[in-house]
Regions:
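Metal- or metallocofactor-binding catalytic centers and their adjacent structured scaffolds
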Residues: 219-261
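C-terminal or mid-to-C-terminal helical accessory/interaction module adjacent to the motor/catalytic core
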Residues: 115-197
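Alpha-helical scaffold elements adjacent to nucleotide-binding pockets in ATP/GTP-utilizing enzyme cores
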Residues: 16-20, 66, 89-97, 119-123, ...
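C-terminal helical "lid" subdomain and adjoining coupling/linker elements of P-loop NTPases
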Residues: 159, 178-228, 275
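Short helix-coil junctions and helix-kink-helix linkers
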Residues: 267-279, 493-503
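Intrinsically disordered, low-complexity regulatory segments
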Residues: 1-142, 223-227, 234, 339, ...
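Core structural elements
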Residues: 141-150, 169, 199-201, 255-267, ...
Length: 887
């Protein structure tokens, strides 16, 4: 009997399924998408009903050849990609490509929500057909994003600079961040006061707060004139200190708290950001590994959680039975909620998949600890705890509120104090969380104090109505209203979800794009828009009326949902979208200002709402008196004189402002050349350095390293060797492109020792005969093929000779982030991304003696640095040629 062929996306998933299905099935991986729109050109024929022109992705020819070979003689080909739009599209593309080569095979869709033996065997035993409505929704989204991405980005290139980009959802997310920052800048803090007190009864003290004055409730938000000044607050304090404190009422209420539902994708992303400090991308990468399966010793490979891309809170009946039995066994019958708790679905939820939950209640976190990485265990514990607590009894607290009158005999003034105490009577579902639940909100600006004292925490002594209490202290405490907080990843995801922008499965990519494009940066895990990001938003708002509004983007998502549900044809949805888009695009082409020749600063202020000039120089050049213009160059935005080249005045617009860097350790530094004081500066690229205050007469600079917001100088370091040309010591210098060795007699002696050829040990994936070497370009080290110029293949990140555990690509890239080193697969559709500690360490780069690779590199050949990656500070743009070596 011929084997059936099962195709999944990743090798890890394939290994797991192969163990479940046995010898009658051949399980292979397609490594994600096999076809897509070409990288160059729009490749959408509007005249033929938006017909897309797909092509096999580079590197997938060999994968498809292996799949065709594996399918020879197979009676059935099971397409078992993920159960969502992207997975459905992968299955459809596979069928379209493989069907001509396997005419006798029957193509069936195998779909499962969890990778367990029972779920997989059931899916293969009862396969279905490819859902063409899902495929249509994916095609519509892909085509819309291609039209917007190419045509709006092309507009930015023509008006501003080559390399800028915009996107249907990415630009809306960026706009949200920019508008929040503008709101913060316009915010004016308002001072106000409160009067916290400490009361006592029989030597037991407890906190209270003045909440009433002259019989009216006080407002603690800066709007109450009765507490607007310290003098007014001190008058209240004086009254309380001279008053008798009599208890007016004591009220005890019982409050029940029900647990939150099991995780949806967005809620998991938010909780992981708040509780674990994970980025959205990191959360999804770890969840993917938990879903695809982990080797659990004698148990074999098991998928630990259900599919992690879902907006549903629904749970399978058998899972509900299992979790309630687990609660009963661990905490007793009283801990189980009397009724099975079923959570209401949010409006617009697809409900195609279950909520994210453990696949087996027989695998608590303690049972799998030794098989998981640190990140995997943390996230699995979060999913486990959330699911278990969702079927537990409510927590019960008793809240006691004591209202107290402060009155002076013979006077009309009366102050009202309130003390609140909370006692947890039954932990209920909180037992599963140990300390605290994961529903702590990240947002909130801290405005307002509330009526209770110290938020009602703690126990109060026994107090009865009519009793007199003692006063320990009463003070006037100053406050200021706070601006709305910046968005972190969790709060931005929450905002996007609540407003229907994008889908949870796309949030990680959206946040990655706006950060990689250098449109935002992070400070204290919060997004701050860069000058470039502000400019892009202003240009989009100027050129497009409502195309990048949250409401329009949300309506577009609803239409894609209708396509998936089968109530709207995908071509009709595209036609409606494109009709408006073409009109908006042409209007923007005429309306949008151009920065190609520079834009006068006076016009910048009139035109742009969100763009801000740090260290604003005014409208005229301080050297020539001509107008100043905003311009865009290879290193980013800057200000220049309109009289150029007669006047060479320029001013940088740094991404990180000097006042955000702690330069306390650099105070008192003097110039080695002229003795003048040195001052912290930031260049156009955002890099910090010490510059001589005697500039331009003295141009001496010292590189500065900024880490954690703190700056430290990096002076030259002697190597212990002498210059062969002049005899002076050789030193390690710290240039803008990295460290290098040179003569300390520079500039009189320009000797620099030749660099050895350094290989990474990775074979070139393009020409397959060369080797990837370490090279140095104008933007720092990069990695290029030894066969340059015949083969131009290069990398910005360091490749290492280690196969990707997910897709099998024979190398991974090393990326350094604030959280440490990460290993990333660049294969499109793979998305593998893991911390260094999760993988074995790689061998260091091998140094090869000079001339060892002469034959491979070619005499005198110099490989150009790659174009700046999206992670660099500013786009390199058109015409960015590699710096030529002198001599």
């Amino acid at each position: 009997m011929a084997k059936s062929l099962v195709i999944v996306e990743s090798p890890a998933k394939a290994d797991t399924l192969a163990k479940f299905l046995g010898k009658d099935f051949s399980v292979r991986a397609c490594y994600g998408h096999v076809r897509d729109l070409p990288r160059k050109g729009i490749s959408i024929d509007r005249a033929k009903g938006y017909e897309p022109s797909y092509e096999v992705l580079p590197g997938k020819e060999r994968v498809l050849a292996e799949l065709k070979k594996a399918g020879k003689g197979a009676g059935t080909v099971f397409l078992a990609a993920d159960p969502d739009r992207e997975g459905e599209a992968i299955c459809w593309h596979l069928r379209e490509v493989l069907r001509p080569a396997l005419p006798a095979a029957e193509f069936r869709r195998a779909e499962f929500q969890e990778i367990t033996k029972s779920a997989v065997t059931r899916a293969v035993a009862h396969p279905g057909k490819i859902d063409m409505n899902r495929v249509g929704a994916q095609q519509a989204r892909r085509i819309i994003d291609r039209l917007v991405g190419y045509e709006v980005s092309d507009l930015l290139w023509s008006k501003v600079w080559r390399g800028l980009s915009a996107g249907r959802v990415q630009t809306v997310a960026l706009r949200i961040v920019v508008e929040r920052e503008t709101e913060r800048e316009k915010f004016v803090a308002v001072p106000y006061f409160s009067v916290p007190c400490t009361l006592e009864k029989q030597d037991v003290s407890f906190p209270a707060r003045v909440v009433l004055w002259h019989g009216e409730k006080l407002r603690f938000d800066g709007t109450d004139p009765r507490l607007a000044t310290r003098e007014a607050a001190e008058a209240v304090v004086a009254h309380v200190r001279s008053s008798a404190l009599r208890v007016l009422s004591v009220e005890a209420k019982e409050r029940k708290s029900v647990p939150p539902p099991p995780f949806t994708t967005s809620k998991l992303q938010q909780a992981a950001a708040r509780v674990l400090g994970f980025t959205v991308r990191r959360t999804m990468q770890v969840a993917q590994r938990l879903y695809e399966g982990k080797a659990l010793g004698e148990r074999g490979t098991v998928g630990l959680i259900t599919y992690m891309r879902t907006d549903s809170t629904r749970t399978a009946e058998e899972a509900l039975v299992a979790v309630r039995e687990t609660i009963r066994r661990v905490w007793g019958e009283a801990a189980v909620n009397p009724e099975v708790r079923r959570f209401r679905q949010k409006k617009g939820a697809q409900d195609a998949h279950e909520a994210i939950r453990p696949t087996s209640m027989d695998l608590p976190p303690e049972a799998v600890t030794r098989f998981l990485t640190s990140d995997e265990l943390k996230l699995y514990r979060l999913v486990w705890t959330r699911f278990v607590s969702s079927q537990m009894s409510p927590s019960v607290s008793e809240i006691t509120t004591v209202d107290i009158e402060a009155r002076v005999d013979g006077r009309d003034e009366v102050a009202g104090l309130r003390a609140t105490g909370t006692v947890l009577k039954d932990a209920g579902w909180l037992r599963a969380h140990g300390e605290a639940a994961d529903e702590t909100p990240e947002e909130g600006n801290g405005n307002g104090i509330g009526d209770d004292a110290e938020n009602g925490k703690g126990r109060l002594p026994q107090i009865g109505e009519g009793e007199t209490l003692g006063l320990v202290s009463a003070e006037a405490e100053g406050h200021e209203t706070q601006p709305p907080p910046r968005f972190g990843e969790a709060s931005l995801v929450k905002f996007l979800e609540e407003n229907g922008i994008g889908r949870p499965s796309t949030y990680a990519e959206i946040l990655r794009k706006i950060e990689d494009r250098a449109y935002v940066r992070k400070k204290d895990r919060r997004f701050i828009p860069t000058p470039l990001g502000r400019l892009v938003v202003d240009l989009m708002l100027e050129g497009f009326d409502d195309f990048f509004e949250t409401g329009y983007t949300a309506r577009m998502e609803e239409e894609l949902d209708e396509v998936e549900e089968g109530s709207l044809d995908w071509r009709k949805a595209l036609a409606e979208f494109d009709g408006k888009f073409v009109k908006d695009r042409e209007r923007a082409r005429k309306k949008m200002v151009s920065l190609k020749a520079g834009l006068p600063l006076a016009e910048v202020r009139k035109t742009f709402v969100h763009f801000r000039l740090p260290n604003d120089p005014g409208d005229t050049c301080p050297k020539s008196g001509d107008a100043l213009k905003l311009r865009m160059g290879k290193a980013g935005l800057f200000i220049a004189c309109a009289g150029y080249p007669k006047c060479d005045f320029t001013q940088d617009i740094p991404e990180v402002e000097e006042d955000e860097i702690d330069a306390s350790d650099l105070e008192g530094q003097t110039c080695d050349d002229c003795g003048s004081p040195m001052k912290l500066r930031t260049g156009r690229s955002g890099s910090a350095f010490l510059g001589c205050t005697a500039y331009p007469a003295c141009r001496n600079t010292v590189p500065v390293r900024v880490a954690g917001g703190k700056a430290e100088a990096r002076p030259d370091v002697p190597t212990g060797e002498s210059c062969p040309d002049c005899g002076k010591p050789l030193v390690t210098k710290h240039g803008r492109y990295g460290d290098y060795v040179a003569c300390s007699g520079w500039p009189a002696c320009r000797y620099r020792p030749p660099k050895p050829v350094i290989t990474t040990g990775v074979a070139c994936p393009e020409c397959r005969t060369g080797e990837i070497l370490v090279r140095r370009g104008r933007f720092g080290p990069f990695y290029g093929c030894s066969n340059y110029p015949k083969c131009p293949r290069n990398f910005r990140a360091r490749p290492v000779p280690k196969a990707c555990p997910s897709c099998g690509t024979p190398y991974l890239l090393v990326r350094d982030r604030k959280a440490g080193a990460f290993f990333v697969c660049e294969k499109e559709g793979c998305g593998f991304d893991a911390p260094a500690q999760d993988l074995e360490l790689f061998t260091p780069v091998t140094k090869v003696p000079e001339g060892a690779l002469t034959a491979a590199t070619g005499a005198g050949a110099t490989a150009p640095a790659p174009k700046r990656s999206a992670r660099t500070k500013a786009p390199r743009g058109a015409g960015g040629k590699p710096r030529k070596k002198k001599g």
